[in-house]
From Swiss-Prot:
GO cellular component terms, semicolon-separated: cytosol; nucleus
Protein species of origin: Danio rerio
Keyword Cytoplasm: yes
Keyword Hydrolase set for record: yes
Subunit note: Monomer.
EC number of the protein: 3.5.1.122
Residue stretches in coiled coil: none
Family assignment from sequence similarity: Belongs to the NTAQ1 family.
Protein name stated in the entry: Protein N-terminal glutamine amidohydrolase
Gene3D superfamilies referenced in this protein's UniProt entry, alphabetically: Protein N-terminal glutamine amidohydrolase, alpha beta roll
Main enzyme class: hydrolase
Catalytic site: C27, H80, D96
InterPro entries: N_Gln_amidohydro_ab_roll_sf, NTAQ1, Prot_N_Gln_amidohydro_ab_roll
Catalyses which reaction(s): N-terminal L-glutaminyl-[protein] + H2O = N-terminal L-glutamyl-[protein] + NH4(+)
Amino acid sequence: MNEESASSEYKVITPSGNQCVYTSCYCEENVWKLCEYIKNQRHCPLEEVYAVFISNERKKIPIWKQKSSRGDEPVIWDYHVILLHASKQGPSFIYDLDTILPFPCSLDVYSMEAFQSDKHLKPAYWRKLRVIPGDTYLKEFASDRSHMKDSDGNWRMPPPAYPCLETPESKMNLDDFICMDPRVGYGEVYSLSDFVKHFGVK
């Protein structure tokens, strides 16, 4: 079976993009809400679903094909978060509510179009990816949204309408997820090439 026919049989595990809970510039919470939906609706086993934080030591990562892109230029994010569905039945798919690519998009297409390659980038822009199991993300992630306030306490971008996400242990641990030191936080940290090799078409 080739990738095209496998993709045509893929069952989407979230609402359509315009029906998802979405707040601009709060990608970490948008993905948390996707994980919550998948857990509640049981469209697939939660162990097939991962939150993927993309960043690096300098917090400068280029991603192409974003809604805020200008033409063919990438957006340089400090970090970005997407959802990975690593299905046991076929190719992996990416759910990115900020892309102009299909929602969802096969990992192979997303990696070619949105990630492209680190080969022609300066090392300061090389991407790393922290891959966290969906269940762990739901249980452990917390954000008081303070990173979205300026020095005067004003919102840089309007926050989500629902309450802040917190755990019994923490009200703010976002930096542990953005950090690409494998000794810190949850999940596994990959280089871009290792991520694509591990989760891409076998």
